[in-house]
């Protein structure tokens, strides 16, 4: 399953637009602590009203990502240029508040970080979502089971697992790495 997770959105219009995008690119919509009633997003959701009704609301980022296989977070200038990132079929996307993005703590729940290369480092939330959801949708790479790296977390700690995850290794690279470590 892949989802787009929006943390503390401030503008209802953006959630309506993101519901429409999710309908087009086959993402589930998850929202963490919205600053408004989601019903306010109806006008921009157009024909994605059912997607909007099925939007899941969470109290914490941890709850929103716990059942997802691979989560990519966004931060201007941090991580990998989204054009060069190898999105996989199980990649979920997490975006932050319109005014300030994701916090450092929230980024810790991400397996990888990407940024969108642009002349100005701030995009509208729904516009950023559209670029990343299209790039993920366009990907033909099979998903990598990130849970296979749990051995590394148990043996060497969460930081090493996070470092390896953020490198976005292929299945073959994970197989090779696990073979060397065991």
Language model regions located:
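Post-transcriptional modification and biogenesis factors for structured RNAs
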Residues: 1-182
């Amino acid at each position: 399953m892949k989802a787009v997770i929006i943390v503390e959105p401030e503008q209802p219009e953006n959630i309506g637009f993101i519901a429409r995008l999710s309908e087009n690119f086959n993402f589930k919509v998850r929202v963490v602590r919205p600053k408004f009633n989601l019903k306010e997003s109806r006008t921009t959701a157009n024909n994605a009203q059912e997607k909007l009704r099925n939007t899941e609301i969470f109290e914490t980022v941890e709850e929103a990502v716990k059942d997802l296989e691979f989560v990519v977070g966004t931060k201007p200038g941090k991580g990998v240029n989204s054009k060069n990132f190898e999105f996989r079929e199980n990649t979920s996307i997490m975006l932050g508040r319109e005014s300030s993005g994701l916090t450092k703590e929230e980024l810790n729940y991400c397996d990888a970080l990407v940024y969108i290369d642009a002349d100005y480092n701030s995009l509208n939330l729904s516009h950023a979502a559209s670029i990343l959801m299209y790039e993920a949708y366009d990907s033909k790479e099979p998903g990598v089971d990130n849970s296979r790296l749990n051995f590394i977390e148990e043996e060497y700690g969460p930081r090493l697992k996070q470092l390896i995850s953020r490198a976005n290794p292929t299945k073959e690279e994970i197989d090779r790495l696990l073979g060397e470590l065991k």
